[in-house]
Amino acid sequence: MKMTRHAPFEKLSNIFKDYPYIASAYLFGSHVSGKENQESDVDIAILIKGNAPRGRELLHEEDYLAYKVAKVLGAKEVDLIDLNSKGMIFQHNVLRTGNLIYDSDPAFRIKFETSVIIRFCDFEPTLRYLEGHQLQGRIGRYTRP
């Protein structure tokens, strides 16, 4: 996981610091893959510690945070994703392809990343097996006379 050091994203540290429950943030999606265009949104996954607000209060704070991030970056839209609440495959994809843009609690982040990687490695053979059977099913469906 590399730490991104681009001027616009460095400015985000000052915004994220106002939210002590955010352990780290990852930029992912088209802005990392180099496929962004004028219509692209900015995808940011945030890793939240246990001391975060709950329910509506958290949603309100995340919406306001997305607004502030969009304003700083000059982006039309920012998708702010709560990484904790997503599935293991999504989490692994963010860790594998994303760039770390904020890190206030490295110990918490490393523990989270380690857990995701271990769970993914345990599950990967099953995932590959399922993908193989799904592909065989599609091939069989389209090659029948």
Regions found by a protein language model. Name each.
Residues 41-43:
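Short glycine-rich His-centered loop
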Residues 45-49:
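Short hydrophobic/aromatic beta-strand micro-patches
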Residues 1-24, 32-38, 51-145:
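Catalytic core of pol beta-like nucleotidyltransferases
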